[in-house]
Amino acid sequence: MNDNIIKGERKIARKLREWYPGAIYHLMHRGVRRTEIFSDETDYQVFLEILKVALDKYQCKIHAYCMMTNHIHLLLETSEDEIGRFMKCLSERYAMYFNHKYQYRGHLFESRYKSCLVKEDSYFLQTSRYIHLNPVKARIVVKPEDYRWSSYQTMIALKDDRITERNRTLAYFKDNSILRYRDFVEDIGHKYVVQEHEIKK
């Protein structure tokens, strides 16, 4: 009997994620049943601290991030460890904090995060823009710089979150790279090229 058939049901194996040292991913992790994973300002701050710990532990680089009320987006560059180890550390540590604070039982996040391997330079830039425009698309703010819980303010030098790696992104733009990147993101004529359905499970 086929090992994938158990009790008359077919067990479908999950496709392994493509990975290699230095691989860059667009990652999206959502709260289970689209429930809130951030309820107040402290939650966002704690998540950022846990993100810092995970980045340091697995020597990853974050090129862009955005924390929405019920999901997160990351543009992440790996090092010598497969992406799953980083995501496990990040999600489990935050879930422990959240469940303890709110006396919540059960899973906080959907069982499997979504990911898309970013290989082309153009897709890297589109993904960075897409992530930073999430709060605008959701009509939370008019301008991406007005949203506190993303890396955009750091990218355009309004603050330094000591997390975001700006150099790779800004290197695509020559003179006045910060201004040119800002124009690239906030260009009202652009379209949201990167769509959520393109982020594979």
Task: Identify the role of each PLM range.
Residues 71:
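Short acidic-rich active-site patches of cyclic nucleotide enzymes
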Residues 1-64, 68, 77-201:
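Short Pro-Cys-Gly-centered "Cys-loop" motif that presents a nucleophilic cysteine in a tight turn
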